[in-house]
Amino acid sequence: MASRWQNMGTSVRRRSLQHQEQLEDSKELQPVVSHQETSVGALGSLCRQFQRRLPLRAVNLNLRAGPSWKRLETPEPGQQGLQAAARSAKSALGAVSQRIQESCQSGTKWLVETQVKARRRKRGAQKGSGSPTHSLSQKSTRLSGAAPAHSAADPWEKEHHRLSVRMGSHAHPLRRSRREAAFRSPYSSTEPLCSPSESDSDLEPVGAGIQHLQKLSQELDEAIMAEERKQALSDRQGFILKDVYASP
């Protein structure tokens, strides 16, 4: 009996000690949990304030263009050299043809501008040469027709008519000298700077060069196609031989 009572006392003591330890642990954990709750609450309030103040904006991903995919199949060295030569030849031919086309366009544009300028000068010269003679003839007819009618009326008109008859062709020397100088200047010539035959002769080698380049590019394409056909036939024969040797 005494031993049983002793065992019961030790068990009760152990239970009381365990209970005290649990209480101490719970007391220590309570401030940590409360501190975490307060920190979470402060962060939540800050997030709410920022959500209210800062508006949402569109996100710029700054995505660049995708990678340039290359061929996974490695061509043979002979094909690599042929393809590189074809690419370089095509690029050179394209650059040369572009330059020739630009020069042709600039030449045709210059020819059109010169022709238009020449026509304008011709029209201006025709207008300038036709209008003064017409006005002078009208004035002379008016004076000749009006003089006999008013010959006995006004002596001043008679004197003016006499002076005009005496002056004759020297009535307006300054205007005529200016007009003659304008017609003698090289800028008033109505002929174009270059004749159509010269322009055609300048454009003939350009056209021949373009045709030659087109012919070269066509021959190069045909050679490339023939080489590709030969390569395809050789590959096919190789596959057939492999199948024959592999079959029992």
Swiss-Prot record:
Reported impact of residue 129 to A: No effect on phosphorylation
Subcellular location(s) per record: Nucleus; Nucleus, Nucleolus
Segments carrying motif D-box 1: 14-17
Swiss-Prot/TrEMBL domain comment: The N-terminal destruction box 2 (D-box 2) is required for APC/C ubiquitination and proteasomal degradation.
PANTHER family: PICALM INTERACTING MITOTIC REGULATOR PIMREG, PROTEIN PIMREG
Role this protein plays: During mitosis, may play a role in the control of metaphase-to-anaphase transition.
Identification of the protein by name: Protein PIMREG
Organism from which the protein derives: Homo sapiens (Human)
Protein encoded by which gene: PIMREG
